[in-house]
Amino acid sequence: MYKFRIQGSDKPLSGEVTISGAKNAALPILFASLLAEEPVEVANVPKLRDVDTTMELLKRLGAEVSRNGSVHIDASGVNDFCAPYDLVKTMRASIWALGPLVARFGKGQVSLPGGCAIGARPVDLHIHGLEQLGATIKLEEGYVKAEVDGRLKGAHIVMDKVSVGATITVMCAATLAEGTTVLENAAREPEIVDTANFLNAIGAKVSGMGTDTITIEGVERLGGGYHEVVADRIETGTFLVAAAVSGGKIVCKNTKAHLLEAVLAKLEEAGADVQTGDDWISLDMTGRELKAVNIRTAPHPAFPTDMQAQFTLLNMMAKGSGIITETIFENRFMHIPELQRMGAHAEIEGNTAICGDTDGLSGAQVMATDLRASASLVIAGCIAKGETIVDRIYHIARGYDKIEDKLTALGANIERVHSDDL
């Protein structure tokens, strides 16, 4: 079991960091490659545990998968239609295999997935969407099993609630359906737009992505193509917050400002000087006072839930107090008790956290509880006084590509160590 050992410092985190491709776009795109009858090349794919698991799953299904810079996938030889428990037990994204399998092959089954411990993430919306396209769904022996006689049929679908995952499932499956599908109350996240752009690159006819109404005109087959994954807006925001809370100056390269406008607006409200270019974002906190801000998470284009933990830390270190309201997931303040172990001030009332006016942090042994919470603990360790040990860092490996190397380049003193060496 590996942990992070961090020697805290009052030295600002400053420098340049190159942002990786977005995990939340790369995963659905890799699964969507199952729709293609010809080879596809996907560039700018981050090197993450979930990506490795997805590539292994595609191989298990019969696809040829290799990585040489880009990820190359040839799904022409897929001959197995089951995503087994041993591969998907740690990754809820595996549900995205179901839509492409049933759309192209008429059948598919996926073990009910796992993932982060941040509340209920039911697959009901995925199932309901596929049923409206004509699939028959059964839940048996821990598996979601889908079948259709012939092709799926286009439908007018109104999502019961805004869901990124279910929007992707329905959008991908509908590409090979007979007729046109109109998906209303669709999620609008940039990663959905990117997935749609990939689908169009291999021959799909998807329009309206980025709005709440997506139209998919079904085609008989999808070929091959090339696509470059969009930049990771959450990794971008995480490093911007790291610079802000440490009083540093940073340039994030290979990223786009339009992906995280709500986050940039809150950073400016917190007192940071934020500048943007075609493929970069800079933040300068030198000589500036960090001010607490109020945050309410909501579906895109509002403030993203995946940046909530990082802004919880920002508010703790800022002047004044800020109110953070979490509307997307229950049980997503699990990082706060860990930050309190380091001396942070916060009160939790239901889905609201009030934090601020923390007079410095002290190093401590803390435990990561989910992907984004772990990022806030790592940043806290960088600015705390003394040594911090972050346990269960396998969470962070699911979503951040070489985070310790990137933080080291900004001046942090962080190393990955085995438990036996502590």
Curated annotation (Swiss-Prot):
GO terms assigned for molecular function: UDP-N-acetylglucosamine 1-carboxyvinyltransferase activity
NAD as UniProt keyword: no
Keywords: Cell cycle, Cell division, Cell shape, Cell wall biogenesis/degradation, Cytoplasm, Peptidoglycan synthesis, Pyruvate, Transferase
Subcellular location: Cytoplasm
Swiss-Prot/TrEMBL catalytic activity: phosphoenolpyruvate + UDP-N-acetyl-alpha-D-glucosamine = UDP-N-acetyl-3-O-(1-carboxyvinyl)-alpha-D-glucosamine + phosphate
Residue numbers binding UDP-N-acetyl-alpha-D-glucosamine: R92, R121, P122, V123, D124, L125, K161, V162, S163, V164, D306, I328
Chief location category: cytoplasm
One GO term describing the cellular component: cytoplasm
Pathway as given in its UniProt record: Cell wall biogenesis; peptidoglycan biosynthesis
Protein family per UniProt: Belongs to the EPSP synthase family. MurA subfamily.
Protein name per the record: UDP-N-acetylglucosamine 1-carboxyvinyltransferase
Lineage: Bacteria, Pseudomonadati, Pseudomonadota, Gammaproteobacteria, Vibrionales
Gene from which the chain derives: murA
